[in-house]
Structures are given as C-alpha cells and as structure tokens.
Amino acid sequence: MSNLPFTVAALYCFAPLPQYESLREPLAQLCCANGIKGTLLLAAEGINGTVAGSAGAIEKLIAHITAIPGLGEPELKYSHASEMPFHRMKVRLKREIVTMGVEGIDPLKSVGTYIVPKDWNALIADENTVVVDTRNDYEYAIGTFEGAIDPQTRTFRAFPEWVKQNRDRLEGKKIAMFCTGGIRCEKATAFVKGLGFDDVYHLKGGILKYLEEVPREQSMWNGECFVFDERVAVGHGLAESDVELCRACRRPLTPQDKLSQFFEEGVSCAGCYAERTPEDRARYAERQKQVKLAEKRGANKHIGS
C-alpha cells in the first residue's frame, strides 16, 4: 500500500461501443465531481486513458467504466504519485483509442500471444527471439529491454511501415513486442499477424506491469519507463524517477542530458537545439521567465506546458 496521495490508473479495453459519443458527458461529470484529472479516449473500438485522483475517486471511476454495457473489465495498471500528475481532465471522442492509422486492424479478432511478466525474461533471452520496442524513439532513449530493437519512430503511425521495411529481420523468428501499458501491442501484434507471421507475442500489461511485478535483481529492463504525465518516467516498483521534460520539445531528459552545453531550462536541450531558431529560443526564454514568476507568486506552474 503506497503512502503517496494520488492513485494513477492506466486503463484500456477494446470492445464494440457503437454509442460511444453518449458516454462522454457522464464520464466527464463523474471525473469533475471527484477531482479526477487526466485523459480518457472514447471510440467505436473501446476506451483508453490514464487518470489520477484519490484512491476512492479512482475506484468510483473504474466501477463506472466496468458497468458500461458491452465493455467489461478493462486492462488496468495502478501506480502512485506524490503530486497530481495532470493539469486538467479531458474526455475525447476519437476514431481510434490508439492511433495506428491502418484500416481493419481489430485486436478482438486477431492478436499476439500474451506473455505474463514472470515468463517474459525467458522469451526475450531465447536466441531465436527478436525483441521489438513498439514505442517511440524518445521513449526508447531513456529505457528499454536488453537486446530490444529500436524502430526509431516518432509516432505509432510510423510503426507499420517500419515492419514492412524490416520483414527480413523478423522472418523465421519468435517476435516479442512490448510497450508502456500494452495497448499499442494489441494493434501492433494484430498488424504483424495480418502480414502472415505466426510466432507473435506481447508483454501482458506492458512495461508498467513488468516493473511492478519483477524484482529489480531479476529484471532485464534497463533505465526508466517514459509515461505521458508530469512524472515523466517511472522505474522499478513504479517509483518516481529523476527524469524531466524539455519544455521546448517535450523530450525526456536524464540528469546526464541536462549537463549538455545545449541544455537551458525551458528553452532547449541537445535534442532540439538545432531544430529551433534563435527567435524560437528567445520566445521560450521569455515563457520560462513567466513560469518562474508565476511559481514565485504561487500560481499555476504549467504555463506553456
């Protein structure tokens, strides 16, 4: 049982929701009434999101979601935070609950074989297994599994094209895929199976469940796991990390990254310095100045974030 005041719930469920638009307002009202913040995505294919609040508030929300007709029990990962990791609550209507951009991909019809965390090490240690990180390059940069391939994608939409261009690396192998909480792998494995690959596996519950259940001394995970909230990243046991965001480009920064000559808080980092003009950096510097002034006054500290 954590002593930290905020419970963070990452959840998803693929299920036919033909009337998903009607679910938006009741969810938004429940979250607002109970002080819950974060993002929930609704689409005809299901629900996805990460939210935070008191333990009791999150319990109410999960009960509400589970009771939605046709939805059932969502895939859930819990962690905890010392501060509220979101600034506001958003319930959005989308075409997909995780955007791959490939028509006809349905994890309810075809998906890879789930591998629970305790069995994951044996699979990825097998010399006939190719391990694929389905996340984006900035996520891979701060942590991944031993021997994992980095597809070097900036968005999940780019992943299908990477697979097509790298079929020769996957042929005749066991294909083990992983992502943060499992949802991207639902579609990634469905897509790969649709190309004719049979030995396709994915980590059930994603990296978050692995870090929660597998002891550090047995772990094959190196680094931190990027999360899409103000905690930025978590480590073994889902402990908060010392990784921060570059507020100019939103890349994750380790303490080592902040030693770069190109790092200036709120203005630039080694990853984005060359991508920005002097005018951009001057604008970011002024924004950072306003952030610091707001913090001194005790105002919101997420200006421009």
UniProtKB/Swiss-Prot annotation:
It comes from the Bacteria. Residues 125-219 form the Rhodanese domain. One of its GO terms (biological process) is tRNA modification. The active site is at C179 (cysteine persulfide intermediate). Its EC number is 1.14.-.-. The keyword Transcription does not apply. InterPro entries: Rhodanese-like_dom, Rhodanese-like_dom_sf, TrhO, TRHO_N. The keyword tRNA processing applies. Keywords: Oxidoreductase, tRNA processing. It catalyses: uridine(34) in tRNA + AH2 + O2 = 5-hydroxyuridine(34) in tRNA + A + H2O. SUPFAM superfamilies: Rhodanese/Cell cycle control phosphatase. GO terms for molecular function: oxidoreductase activity, acting on paired donors, with incorporation or reduction of molecular oxygen. Transmembrane segments: none annotated. Belongs to the TrhO family. NCBIfam families: PRK00142.1-4. Catalyzes oxygen-dependent 5-hydroxyuridine (ho5U) modification at position 34 in tRNAs. This is tRNA uridine(34) hydroxylase. The lineage of its organism: Bacteria, Pseudomonadati, Pseudomonadota, Alphaproteobacteria, Hyphomicrobiales.
